[in-house]
Amino acid sequence: MSITSPPIEVSVLTDSIKNLLEKNFLRVVVKGELSNVSLQTSGHLYFAIKDSKAVLNGAFFHFRSKYFDRKPKDGDYVILHGKLTVYAPRGQYQIVAYALTFSGEGNLLQQFEERKQRLAAEGYFDPKRKKPLPSGARVIGVITSPTGAVIQDILRVLSRRCHQFQVILYPVTVQGATAAQEISQAIQFFNQNSMGVHALIIARGGGSIEDLWAFNEEELVKSIVASSIPIISAVGHETDFTLCDFASDVRAPTPSAAAEIVCKSSDQYRQELQNLRRYVLSHARQFIAAKKNLLTHWQRHLASVDFYHTAQQTLDYTRAALERGIETKLEYYKQRFAQYRRWLKSDVLIRIEKHLADLNQSLMLSIKNKIYTKKTSLNQLYTSCLKNELLNLQHHTQHSRNILSQLSRRLHIAIASSQQTHQECLVRLQNELSFTIHHLLTKAKERCQAIQEQASSLNPKNVLKRGFAQLFDFNKHFVIISAESLKQSDLVRVCLQDGEAVVSVKEVWLNNDKKG
């Protein structure tokens, strides 16, 4: 613009600068230290973000509705996502933020994404290596805290959905420096010990990214991938995602959902998959159509939204100025009132206080006289009533003594006549009680002996003593119960009463037919 150009109004120049900023800095990411933080009753946040060399004012509209669980304060180091604009009434440029991340959380999120990409590239999250859940799982290993609500939720769901199930709990800490190592050791324990577990559930309640960080450790991811037992990850709430979720064979949104998943049959899986497919397709179409309409709507009204934000910021500044003005006026009138009070107290208040003192003295004297008169009357009345009550009490006492003497004589006669009868009844009841107790004890001993004999007959070790044996595969991963699983030259581990032996299969017959 040359010197000879016609002058323009300040508002026109400001609008031009605003358009340039918003066009060239539509999306910016700024990091720095917060200062002058002010959260208004409207829910909007105003602040300044600074470093050692510069300061930038900013606003975050509707902050409280988006970040209701945490309030920033002066000195917090944050990362802001937003756009640059100009607040015209003050002629200052500012950032209008739409996302805020505290620095510590930002570092963890960055570390999470880097580790996720690296492990995914190494194949740890490959869907092809995930193991299917067994249909009708009945023995379930649960790795979680033994004292939290998580284990109770899992047991409650399993009790409702499964008629027969067995839960083997491996207690671990689910937060802190040692949590990942303890969970990894639990996975290794279930894999190394033949306990017949069909599936494992790793569970924890919700929390912040710091609380759930143990489930992002590389050690735990590798233990999950190496497990031969299918693992369900149920960590946090539905919106929480950890590396444990990506590495596990199945991810459940909550611990209760994990218990529901592990109890499902294959028919239920197929039916739910079909229902989910129909639901996703239907809602995806609706969602895309709605988002297209919403995008068109906001494109038309984008200019009006910016105007609303400017007006809202002006309103917040005006409200703050009015509040400061009201406080100033209140302080001024407090001082004036104190001054008037000092003036009045010097003359009028002195006379009023003297008159009140005289009235108080006269009133106290009158009250004392009244009290003395009433006290004298009450003493006389009390003495008269006390004498009458004493005479009545003496009369009733003598009458009660006469009645008590008569009742005592009658009671002695009644006791003497019924004592013999009661003694005979007591002897009879004692005999009946002794017989009943002896009969119940005899039946209880017989039942206990029968239970012991039944338990002894069901003990696998006792079965081995009768000449039977148990067959396992060579590595003792599973019990061999069918000849179909054997072939010639297989090595089989035989468990006998007093030891084990490894044998080689020479021939196998099925239903009297020679297999080879």
Swiss-Prot record:
Record's keyword terms, sorted: Cytoplasm, Exonuclease, Hydrolase, Nuclease
A Pfam family assignment: Exonuc_VII_L
Residue runs in coiled coils: none
Lineage: Bacteria, Pseudomonadati, Chlamydiota, Chlamydiia, Chlamydiales
HAMAP family, alphabetized: Exonuc_7_L (MF_00378)
UniProt-recorded Gene Ontology molecular function terms: exodeoxyribonuclease VII activity; nucleic acid binding
Assembly notes: Heterooligomer composed of large and small subunits.
Chief localization: cytoplasm
GO cellular component, one term: cytoplasm
Source taxon at top rank: Bacteria
Family, per entry: Belongs to the XseA family.
Subcellular location: Cytoplasm
Catalytic activity: Exonucleolytic cleavage in either 5'- to 3'- or 3'- to 5'-direction to yield nucleoside 5'-phosphates
InterPro entries xref list: Exonuc_VII_L (IPR003753), Exonuc_VII_lsu_C (IPR020579), OB-fold_nuc-bd_dom (IPR025824)
Name of the protein described by the UniProt record: Exodeoxyribonuclease 7 large subunit
GO biological process, one term: DNA catabolic process
Organism, scientific name: Chlamydia trachomatis serovar D (strain ATCC VR-885 / DSM 19411 / UW-3/Cx)
Stored PANTHER family: EXODEOXYRIBONUCLEASE 7 LARGE SUBUNIT
Enzyme kind, highest EC tier: hydrolase
Assigned EC number: 3.1.11.6
Function, as annotated: Bidirectionally degrades single-stranded DNA into large acid-insoluble oligonucleotides, which are then degraded further into small acid-soluble oligonucleotides.
